[in-house]
């Protein structure tokens, strides 16, 4: 059991028979009246985001999420296919379950797939990935009015802000939690 006052981002709870992940939360202590916790919850099966308010002492059952290492194989236009690295079992996942993670995942990459009661609902890329820059404008010396960064498209199609010295063909390290450039590899 977890109290609403102990919520953190990423905690998975059961509310009204459905499973939600805490996307955002805020403890509110008004001048008058009791304190409360305002939350944004994402339904793990439907992807719908709702806003709910709870008392800080209200308790919820923490959902038991299974995590498995899987290898991304391919996309057939409708589904993304992942293979369990131990059993070699393949599972298809629809775009709505993997859309955010696919910005950083390329074929044959090992990822973490989350399951609830045997059903896959989400894909988590590694914390750091190394991807090749396929398109960016050339950096001009002395052009630091924009803060010394420019947009670059990597091989998965994601657009990342990178320093001016990064060129097409460079491999860069990206933090998948924030989508930020870390270093040139």
From Swiss-Prot:
A Pfam family cross-referenced in the UniProt record is Elong-fact-P_C
Assigned keywords, A-Z: Cytoplasm, Elongation factor, Protein biosynthesis
Q: Tell me a GO biological process for this protein.
A: peptide biosynthetic process
Does the keyword section mention Transport? no
Cite the annotated pathway.
Answer: Protein biosynthesis; polypeptide chain elongation
Q: Which GO terms describe its molecular function?
A: translation elongation factor activity
Can you say where in the cell this protein is located? Cytoplasm
Q: Does the keyword Cytoplasm apply?
A: yes
| A GO CC annotation given for this chain | cytoplasm
Database matches in SUPFAM superfamilies: Nucleic acid-binding proteins (SSF50249), Translation proteins SH3-like domain (SSF50104)
- Record's superkingdom? Bacteria
| Family label | Belongs to the elongation factor P family.
Q: Which NCBIfam families match?
A: efp, PRK00529.1
Role summary: Involved in peptide bond synthesis. Stimulates efficient translation and peptide-bond synthesis on native or reconstituted 70S ribosomes in vitro. Probably functions indirectly by altering the affinity of the ribosome for aminoacyl-tRNA, thus increasing their reactivity as acceptors for peptidyl transferase.
Name-wise, this protein is Elongation factor P
Please report the organism this UniProt entry assigns to the protein: Caldanaerobacter subterraneus subsp. tengcongensis (strain DSM 15242 / JCM 11007 / NBRC 100824 / MB4) (Thermoanaerobacter tengcongensis)
Gene of origin? efp
């Amino acid at each position: 059991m977890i109290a609403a006052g102990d919520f953190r981002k990423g905690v998975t709870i059961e509310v009204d028979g459905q499973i939600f992940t805490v996307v955002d939360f805020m403890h509110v202590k008004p001048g008058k009246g009791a304190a409360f916790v305002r939350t944004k919850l994402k339904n793990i099966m439907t992807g719908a985001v709702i806003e709910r308010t709870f008392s800080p002492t209200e308790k919820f059952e923490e959902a038991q999420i299974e995590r498995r290492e899987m290898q991304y194989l391919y996309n057939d236009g409708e589904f993304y296919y992942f293979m369990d690295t131990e059993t070699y079992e393949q599972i298809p996942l629809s775009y709505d379950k993997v859309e955010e993670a696919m910005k950083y995942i390329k074929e044959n990459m090992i990822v973490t797939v989350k399951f609830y009661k045997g059903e896959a609902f989400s894909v988590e890329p590694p914390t750091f990935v190394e991807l090749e820059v396929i398109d960016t404008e050339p950096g001009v010396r002395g052009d630091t009015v924009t803060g010394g960064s420019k947009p670059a498209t990597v091989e998965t199609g994601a657009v990342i802000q990178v320093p001016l010295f990064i060129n097409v063909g460079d491999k860069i390290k990206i933090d998948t939690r924030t989508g930020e450039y870390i270093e040139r590899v």
